[in-house]
């Protein structure tokens, strides 16, 4: 059974930055994530979407951001367990400061002084079209629920369903890549950002995008691979066949907290309540950082999660080293920190 200072649930940006802050203080970490890759929603849902609000980095894609964080934590000792979910937490009170026994869905067990919940919005899965039986039979055969690579749609006839931010964002983003785009929504009104909707409607005026409202999907066309879809006018009930190479269903996500909701910690608005000094939950030794937590003034931004986990790691150090002062130094001038980072002899 492996013993660590911090067990981190979630390998997204905030979970990765936790490894960095912990490494500066000499704390050992392990990361657990139920996805099959590191990066959380950034890698799974929008790897090629740009991020503009990371301090000092004017523009980078979500995947570039994840890659930069992985590069940043290379000097530190940590392990990653993917395709696993934390199933059970059991407090171990045999020492002055208790530890946590953590068991995963694969049966792996860990003892950790602190547990950081950095699970973003929890586990998530895309919403399927409600009227279609088994749309996943065409998964990776023309149907997708997110954009992993923009190049996949180059010179393709693309059909996008949805009326929120993702549908509008990708309609605008892919307009210069796809051969043609038809955006289908069941209402004339959209739920996305007004500025993006304006951009989309400008593309409609120029003929780069065809807008079909109010329409809903009625059926899929194809045998081995997707060949198109049948859509129905919501008002007239008339149907129409649309031929296409690719379909993007962008109806949003179903979010689930999973076992986190059963751990007996205080919740608010389906998020984990924390204090704003240590970002500790109502249970000692359990911390929540990033989009999973809630407190007055909370903003669901990556940079806020970085701030939260930086302070939380200070308390994790105290738990692993009772009675010791938390060391503090600037990476620009502290030779011990620079040695840990591998930037000095």
Regions found by a protein language model. Give the residues of each.
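Conserved N-terminal glycine-rich FAD pyrophosphate-binding loop of Rossmann-like flavoproteins
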Residues: 36-60, 193-198
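Glycine-rich Rossmann-fold phosphate-binding loop(s) that bind the pyrophosphate
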Residues: 10-14, 162-164
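Rossmann-like NAD(P)H-binding beta-loop-alpha module
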Residues: 23, 36, 154-177
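FAD-binding core/adjacent interface of flavoenzyme oxidoreductases
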Residues: 1-9, 25, 30, 37, ...
């Amino acid at each position: 059974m492996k013993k660590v200072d911090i067990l981190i649930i979630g390998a997204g940006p905030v979970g990765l930055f936790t490894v960095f802050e912990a490494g500066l203080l000499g704390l050992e970490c392990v990361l657990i994530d139920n996805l099959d890759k590191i990066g959380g929603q950034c890698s799974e849902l929008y790897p090629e979407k740009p991020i503009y609000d990371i301090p000092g980095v004017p523009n980078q894609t979500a995947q570039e951001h994840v890659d930069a964080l992985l590069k940043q934590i290379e000097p530190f000792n940590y392990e990653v367990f993917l395709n696993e979910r934390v199933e059970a937490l059991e407090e171990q009170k045999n020492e002055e400061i208790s530890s946590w026994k953590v068991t995963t869905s694969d049966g792996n067990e860990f003892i950790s002084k602190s547990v950081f919940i950095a699970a973003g919005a929890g586990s998530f899965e895309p919403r399927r079209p409600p009227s279609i039986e088994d749309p996943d039979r065409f998964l990776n055969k023309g149907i997708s629920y997110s954009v992993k690579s923009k190049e996949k749609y180059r010179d393709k006839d693309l059909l996008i369903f949805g009326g929120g931010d993702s549908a509008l964002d990708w309609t605008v983003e892919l307009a210069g890549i796809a051969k043609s785009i038809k955006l289908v929504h069941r209402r004339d009104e959209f739920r996305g950002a007004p500025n993006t909707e304006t951009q989309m409607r400008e593309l409609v005026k120029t003929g780069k995008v065809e807008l079909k409202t109010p329409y809903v999907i009625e059926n899929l066309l194809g045998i081995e691979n997707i060949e198109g879809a049948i859509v129905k006018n919501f008002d007239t009930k008339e149907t129409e066949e649309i031929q296409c190479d690719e379909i993007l269903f962008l109806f949003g996500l179903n979010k689930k907290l999973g076992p986190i909701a059963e751990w007996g910690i205080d919740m608010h608005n389906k998020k984990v309540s924390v204090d704003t000094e240590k970002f500790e939950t109502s249970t000692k030794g359990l911390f929540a950082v990033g989009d999973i937590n809630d407190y007055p003034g909370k903003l669901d931004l990556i940079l806020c999660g970085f701030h939260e986990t930086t302070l939380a790691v200070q308390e994790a150090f105290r738990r692993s080293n009772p009675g010791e002062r938390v060391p503090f130094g600037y990476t620009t001038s502290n030779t011990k920190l620079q040695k840990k980072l591998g930037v000095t002899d």
